[in-house]
UniProtKB/Swiss-Prot annotation:
GO terms for molecular function: acyltransferase activity. It catalyses: 2-(methylsulfanyl)acetyl-CoA + butan-1-ol = butyl 2-(methylsulfanyl)acetate + CoA; ethanol + acetyl-CoA = ethyl acetate + CoA; butan-1-ol + acetyl-CoA = butyl acetate + CoA; butan-1-ol + propanoyl-CoA = butyl propanoate + CoA. GO terms for biological process: alcohol metabolic process; fruit ripening, climacteric; response to ethylene. Disulfide bonds: none annotated. Belongs to the plant acyltransferase family. InterPro entries: CAT-like_dom_sf, Plant_acyltransferase. Its EC number is 2.3.1.268. This is Alcohol acyltransferase 9. The active site is at residues 156, 379. Involved in the biosynthesis of volatile esters which confer kiwifruit flavor. Alcohol acyl transferase that can use a wide range of alcohols as substrate to produce esters. Exhibits acetyl-CoA:alcohol O-acyltransferase activity. The gene is AT9. Keywords: Acyltransferase, Transferase.
């Protein structure tokens, strides 16, 4: 039976504690792209110290939120479409971020496994209680064992993963009074014009936006079949073994592979094989690549808007399944190496109005690397989180940090129920 979650206080809007500019800010072309019209939703679970005062903790979180919204005041605004529909703006009038407090009969140990369904943990972030959902919503949920879950939702068009982690670490530092607001680095930087369209017309080929034939009923299957969440942890030893396998099966690997290259390749290959797709079906692996230091000049420290493009590895089911892990890792490496300043600028042009390019879903697996964001360091005075993950585990594959295991990675993704057993077996059998 599903565990219950119940609000114990009326939802509130928390405004910045000090006056902030009343203005309308334009989001960048990357921010405004159609692909990012969804929230980033984190779930952090803390083993609360014995005897913690709930009222004091909740008040401390609320006060810290109000203080952190002063430098990050756009998160207290509201996103709207421009009158000419060319992009998005943030109307900043200190409307406030959402804050909720709840109780649940979940325990911290419930989050050490994969959820039973895609939306099992949905009520740990009840954004729908707000008539207009703010760009930032925080929900503090007290668990039955005395631990606490913190659900945080960001509007992805306002902030990316790196930016959200910088905000959360400031928020947490202010909650514990470990740092003064004036001392915190890096200072948040708006400067969204740095990633706007420059009106280029001669653009290169970008496979992430290309369409491939659906030879397998791929879209229908993922839309209609129940998806089952999975969670598998790869430790340092296992990752080293994947690197060895990749080197032994590669035709081009001259340099040692990174953990990301081999793990992404292994997941992609296992996922494809488990779905039993036609040999000629073209598949794509998409993953985010931070461009803060790839564009010229580099973006300023503290830039918290969307500053990533999608790397794209592409091949057929036949080649992906028959050519081994080294081949897959080479495709991932090649996709990373293609991204430089020119490539990133072309993506900006491609997603801008009126082109508005967006990835298709046919044959696509998307990976997002949360394990390197620093979410495992977000400490509100309750210690470091014992679990870091998403509110909902869906078809986006997430790399997550594992507490006290620096080089380990937890992989969460939901796959069609008919394929889940084979997927998990293949993931645990890298030599197969």
């Amino acid at each position: 039976m599903a565990s219950s979650v119940r609000l114990v206080k009326k939802p509130v809007l928390v405004a910045p504690v000090d006056p902030t500019p009343s203005t309308v800010l334009s989001l960048s072309s990357l921010d405004s792209q159609l692909f990012l019209r969804f929230p980033i939703e984190y779930l952090l679970v803390y083993a609360s110290p014995h005897g913690v005062d709930r009222d004091v903790t909740a008040a401390r979180v609320k006060a810290a939120l109000a203080r952190s919204l002063v430098p990050y005041y756009p998160l207290a605004g509201r996103v709207k479409t421009r009158p000419d529909s060319t992009g998005l703006d943030v109307v900043c009038q200190a409307q406030g971020a959402g804050l909720l407090e709840a109780v649940s009969d979940y325990t911290a140990s419930d989050f050490q496994r994969a959820p039973r369904s895609v939306a099992e943990w949905r009520k740990l972030l009840l954004v729908e209680v707000f008539k207009v959902v703010p760009p930032l919503v925080v929900q503090l949920t007290w668990l039955s064992d005395g631990c606490v879950a913190l659900g945080i939702g960001f509007s992805h068009c306002v902030i990316d993963g790196i930016g959200s982690s910088e905000f959360l670490n400031l928020f947490a530092e202010l909650a514990t009074s470990r740092a003064k607001l004036s001392e915190f680095q890096p200072k948040p930087v708006w400067d969204r014009q740095l990633l706007n369209s420059a009106g280029r017309t001669n653009l290169g080929t970008h496979p992430e936006f290309g369409r491939v034939p659906d030879l397998s009923g791929f879209v229908t299957r993922f839309a209609q079949e129940r998806l089952s969440p999975t969670s598998i942890t790869f430790d340092k030893t296992w990752l080293k073994e994947l690197k060895n396998i990749a080197m032994s099966t590669s035709q081009a690997g001259e340099f040692p592979y990174t953990s990301f290259e081999v793990l992404s390749g292994h997941i992609w290959r296992s996922w494809a094989r488990s779905l039993n797709l036609p040999a000629k079906q073209v598949l794509k692996l998409l993953f985010s690549i931070n461009i803060r230091n790839r564009v010229k000049p580099s973006l300023p420290a503290g830039y918290y808007g969307n500053a990533f493009v999608l790397g794209c590895a592409q091949t057929s089911v036949k080649d992906l399944t028959e050519k081994g892990l080294g081949y897959c890792a080479d495709l991932v490496r090649g996709a990373k190496e293609r991204v430089g300043d020119e490539y990133a600028r072309e993506v900006v042009e491609s997603v801008s109005w009126p082109r508005r390019a967006s990835p298709d879903s046919v044959g696509v697996l998307i990976i997002s690397q949360w394990s390197r964001l620093g979410l495992d360091r977000v400490d509100f005075g309750l210690g470091r989180p014992v679990h870091v993950g998403p509110i909902c585990c869906d078809r986006y594959c997430l790399f997550l940090p594992v507490r006290d295991r620096m080089e380990a990675v937890k992989v969460m993704v939901a796959v069609p129920t008919s394929a889940v057993d084979r997927y998990e077996n293949l993931m645990r059998s890298p030599y197969s």
